[in-house]
Structure formats: C-alpha cells, structure tokens
Amino acid sequence: MKLYFEAEVKSSLQEIKNLFNQELFLKLKPPFMSLELERFDGCEKGHEVHLKMGLPGFLQNWVSHITDSSQTDTAWEFVDEGKILPSPFTYWRHTHRTEKISETSCRISDSIEYGCQSLLLDKLLWGPLW
C-alpha cells in the first residue's frame, strides 16, 4: 500500500532539518499508542532508529535503518526502511522530503510504502495510518 502526505510550512530548510530530532519523534506518536525510543542516531544514511511501540502493555520492536539521505540548496530528504517490524507489518519504506519554496517556507512530503501479512490488513490499516 502507498500513502502520500504533503504540507507547506513557514520555516527555512535548515530550521526544518534541525527539528528532525528525538523530541519531534516522540511528539508525533499516535495518542492511543505507547512508544519508547531506545535509539535515535539521526537522519543520515547509515543511522538507525530503535523503538518499542504498540498498545500499553503490549510493546513490539521496530528498527528502521536510514538507507539514503541527500541535501542540496533547495531540498533535503532521507529514507527509512523497517528492518525489524511489529506485527502485522512485513514491509516499511518511508521517504521524507523537504523542498524549499522560499527563504521562509518549505513543502514537506512523506511517501510511505508498507505491506502487511495480508492484503486485507493492508487495507484495514490504510485508514488509521492516513
């Protein structure tokens, strides 16, 4: 399954890049889930993120590797791919991209590809992930 999100924000490219840290990661967790951040290296190629997440009392491991990252004067992006995923996920690839619109605004886009143990689960999770 594929998801795509896009938003315009009033911040510079560097300001947005600086905000991609542990604090932001924890703020973005869904309210109904528990999340423990065990390791956060950053957003550059070769970095890793290790999580324990799920419903309270039922945490599962999620390990993502940053498999690609690049920056130019007008764009910054990185890709995280799930290496250890909680059930029911079997595949996860998330491309984070920030493009400069002006000195004070950028477009942030997220392209997510994921797979589950069945097509039915893919479709059922599409709504909550969206």
Outline where the language-model segments fall.
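A general secondary-structure boundary signal
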Residues: 6-8, 20, 76-82, 108-113
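Short, surface-exposed coil-to-beta transition loops
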Residues: 2-4, 59-65, 90-95
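A short, structured loop/turn motif at beta-sheet edges
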Residues: 10-14, 42, 67-75, 97-107
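Beta-strand/loop substructures that line and gate deep hydrophobic ligand-binding cavities in soluble
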Residues: 81-130
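Short acidic, gly/pro-rich beta-turn/loop elements at beta-sheet edges
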Residues: 15-17, 28, 59-61, 88-90, ...
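Solvent-exposed residues in well-ordered beta-strands and their adjoining turns
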Residues: 8-12, 52-56, 67, 99-101, ...
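Glycine-rich portal/gate segments that line the openings of hydrophobic small-molecule binding cavities
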Residues: 24-27, 36-86
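Hydrophobic ligand-binding cavity/cleft-lining segments
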Residues: 1-48
